[in-house]
Amino acid sequence: LDRANSMYQRDKNHAAILIWSCGNESFGGKDIFEMSQFFRNTDPTRLVHYEGVCHDRRYNATSDMESQMYPSVEAIKDFLAKDDSKPFICCEYTHAMGNSCGAMHKYTDLTGTEPKYQGGFIWDYIDQSIYKKDRYGKEFQAYGGDFGERPTDYNFSGNGIAYGGNRDASPKMQEVKFNYQNITAQVKEETVKVINKNLFVNTNIFDCKATLQKDGKVVRTAVMETAVEPLSQKEYALPFKKEEKAGEYTVTVSFHLKEDKPWAKAGHEVAFGQYV
């Protein structure tokens, strides 16, 4: 309780704090339940989270949400079919170590079919590595064991969607960005269905561009005007005719910022869809 109070007093005035956590990977029990009650009694405006109750149901009321680590999509479906009394989140999922995040779409697609599934939190955001120079003076991203320490977990700290050091996006970031985009462009031979999953903004606040490529080379581009209201969809004709000459053709419909934002410059791509 003293630890819970210390965290509460430190963070209570931060607007970014939405949920209080009772800890991590610590099973369950009365003391942790009392922590959750402290948060509720002291701050009824925020939710309380604890994953450990999925291993110890004696104090199921500890957490305001069902929280599990790395469940399969089928396991989530099976659980919600039996008990949907709480919203379900993955407090950790799609472990971003090495060449990973490839099946992430199975989880993001689930949000469209399971109303109680609330998504998850990727483990984790940035590689926990630091710059070190090799014997030739060249810098590299060092991890466990690179400093002669033993025992060590070696590269297990390198599991982010962004690289350590300068925070460059890793290839995994592209997969994450696509699955999290708030506009879906379902492109076919002659049409594109634009699904606007944004809660508040129309797609007309973005520039929409269609690009036709043959064998990887741009053949033509065109500007498209879209105006899809939040949480709705609309189908548009593509500005290209169907090509007859042999080759591999791709049609990409993308959405871009019209003006600079605090987080990205004008022209930044926020969503795309492609047909081959």
Regions found by a protein language model. Give the residues of each.
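Extended substrate-binding grooves/exosites of carbohydrate-active enzymes
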Residues: 1-189, 198-204, 209-218
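A short, hydrophobic secondary-structure junction motif
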Residues: 94-95, 255, 274-276
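Generic detector of intrinsically disordered, low-complexity, polar/charged segments
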Residues: 141-145, 157, 244, 264, ...
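A generic structural signal for beta-strand entry/edge sites
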Residues: 189-191, 248
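Intrinsically disordered, low-complexity Pro/Gly/Ser/Thr-rich segments with frequent PxxP/GP/PP motifs
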Residues: 206-208, 213-246, 252-258, 263
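Short beta-strand elements
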Residues: 260-276
